[in-house]
Design a protein with these regions (language model features):
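Membrane-anchoring alpha-helices and their flanking helix-loop junctions
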Residues: 1-90, 105-157
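Membrane-interface loop-to-helix entry segments
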Residues: 92-106
Length: 157
């Protein structure tokens, strides 16, 4: 199944894929966690030096996420590859198949850490599972249908 609303008649993949929906899901989960931290989940709030540690790690993750996003979107010119139905396997895409999703997930982890609530750490594996299941059942299937063995070989690296 393809998202036809985002394609022209010659393009086989949507430009943005399921990405915007997944990013909204991560943001909604983190906002819900923030709201619950103000009430039901107050028992998980950190005090003292751990808050500073969470802030530092969160900031570093958000910085790294921004860099990965820039490399995977701006520097790689992924939009052109998608429009031309080319499989992108160079640059950051030589290291990971889904750097854009990975960057958003890292940014989400960074924001969770900035909330200073240990209960919210449970969101990290939940978000990873959601991203993994959705990507495998949408974009990875679409890419295999479009590129066949070339995509299978790319995944095997």
């Amino acid at each position: 199944m393809y998202l036809k609303s985002d394609q022209d008649k010659h393009q086989k993949l949507p430009t943005y894929g399921v990405g915007p929906y997944l990013v909204v899901c991560i943001i909604a989960m983190n906002l819900t966690g923030w709201m619950l931290s103000q009430s039901e989940l107050q028992s998980g709030l950190l005090k003292g030096g751990f808050k500073d540690l969470f802030d530092l790690i969160g900031f570093i993750l958000m910085f790294v996420a921004t860099r990965i996003w820039w490399l995977s979107v701006v520097k790689s010119d992924i939009d052109t590859s998608i429009q031309n139905n080319e499989l992108k396997t160079t640059g950051i895409y030589a290291r990971t198949r889904n750097p854009i999703y990975f960057s958003w997930w890292l940014c989400g982890i960074g924001s969770i850490l900035h909330l200073h609530n240990v209960w919210l750490l449970l969101l990290i594996p939940i978000q990873w599972v959601i991203l993994t299941v959705v990507i495998r059942n949408t974009e990875e299937k679409w890419l295999y249908e479009l590129h066949g063995e070339a995509y299978k070989d790319y995944c095997a690296r």
